[in-house]
């Protein structure tokens, strides 16, 4: 296990030497790749699929920036002591972080202007396009449309909340929290705890999808 206190102590004592030494450790490169990959999966699987928050143009650009950092972390993790692989990882990390911040700031500005009661706040604000342009002309919207094709408007984040299936939320939360606590103290009984929590969660997700499809059908009629 990584000694976090020891790493922090070394960083405070000799910051330059410590940073150079960290770059030669595979763990930190994998940590960057896993962290960014986890955020991409969270944005897609939870916000886009579960909450039906369609990604806008800036959103897919932010995903691309995170994907670049995942790629750089995996490349550098092959051999962190190789100067070429480490340089690729550093360039990807800096490029992804800078571009991610850039698009995040732009999206935040659009969100502020859209939700500002002052109509003059929209002056000069550029909207989002449904035809994204990725660096190097990569047709990511065609290769992976589920992940990189913008289908929403910038600044309009309206998740579909639970309706009649909302009564299952306390059962899901309480059941799974209780199961996690039981997993630490008594793994054998945790199986029965999850037996109550997981089906409730699956049923709530099913009801959410059913309600959403029914609303779409009513709008179409």
UniProtKB/Swiss-Prot annotation:
The keyword Membrane applies. GO terms for biological process: protein folding. One of its GO terms (molecular function) is protein-disulfide reductase activity. Keywords: Cell inner membrane, Cell membrane, Disulfide bond, Electron transport, Membrane, Oxidoreductase, Redox-active center, Transmembrane, Transmembrane helix, Transport. It is a multi-pass membrane protein. Gene3D superfamilies: DsbB-like. GO terms for cellular component: plasma membrane. PANTHER family: DISULFIDE BOND FORMATION PROTEIN B, PROTEIN-DISULFIDE OXIDOREDUCTASE DSBI. HAMAP family: DsbI (MF_01311). Interacts with DsbL. This is Protein-disulfide oxidoreductase DsbI. It comes from Lelliottia amnigena (Enterobacter amnigenus).
